[in-house]
Amino acid sequence: MPNRRHFIQRSATLLALAAAAPWLPRFAFAADPTQLLQRAIPSSGEKLPVIGLGTSRTFDVRLDDASLKPLDEVLRTFINGGARLIDTAPSYGASEAVTGELLKRTNTQGKAFLATKISATGRERGMAQFEASLKALQTDKLDLVQVHNLQDTRTQLALLRELKAQGKVRYIGITHYIESAHDDLLAVLAQEPVDFVQLNYSVGERNAEKRLLPYCADHGIATLINRPFQRAQLLSRVKGRALPDWAMETDATSWAQLLLKFILANQAVTAVIPATSNPRYMADNLQAGQGRLPDAALRAKIVQAFT
């Protein structure tokens, strides 16, 4: 049965063929964007491709050609595959600067939906951090800015509303990455209007299904999902195992795709943002945004496979 290694080997073969014969179909590395599932941002109706790109750790590299080369390929694969949403943060080391440089090098600044965060205490520090993000990302406005891990939430949301009114930010939101913070996210949502919530949700962390995701669906709040693989912990559980036959019913060809499709099958999810520094993993992840999604019975089988 196909697995992630099989997919990567097949992708490498097709890449070699494409280099030798550029008239051949480009497979997932230049997939038809219309094949990538899109979902609407409830507050505006604007549609986003369901597969985004996280940059935590993976984009925290030196700004030299050797370090940027694989990430350049990741970004080209991402954009050529019809995806748009890139999520970064000032606390991710060099990730913002690397993202900005790569977008400039690939001339894809106008194609990306840029999301970053504020993790500061006090309005002045929040504003300074926002301005530093603009400089690092080489832009004069951002699509989405989120209060990172609910740090000084009310102060920073007030600032973000000002920036939104000025046209410097299109959407605002809040984030967290642990299940124990879900009640805190809900408490903020009950009092503060936002466009987006970013949260952790995966086969191994399903607490969001109980209250947080239903609340967002009912109140028109877009959701971005982080930690879809739990920092690769979930993939390590199935390393070396072949995909079960029933995975074909979801059109998944790797365990990673199966994990992402599990998340996307929840209609309250707007997009998922797996991070990677590997172009072939990026192509693999994009495949999860195409084809069929698992129904309730198949989702139960996916959970069992990782238990």
Model-derived regions, located:
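Conserved, mostly hydrophobic/aromatic
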Residues: I41, L53, I86, T99, ...
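Generic structural signal for well-ordered alpha-helices
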Residues: Q38, L75, E96, G100, ...
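Glycine/proline-rich, positively charged
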Residues: R62, T121-N207, R211, D218-L224, ...
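A cross-domain feature marking catalytic cores of carbohydrate-active enzymes
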Residues: G52-R57, T88-P90, T116-I118, Q146-N149, ...
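Structured C-terminal cap/extension of enzyme domains
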Residues: L14-L17, W23, I41, R211-T307
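A generic structural signal for well-ordered alpha-helical segments
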Residues: F78, N107, K164, C216-A217
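N-terminal binding-site loop/beta-alpha segment at the start of enzyme catalytic domains
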Residues: P2-G110
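Short, electropositive alpha-helical surface patch
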Residues: G100-N107, F113, D284-G291
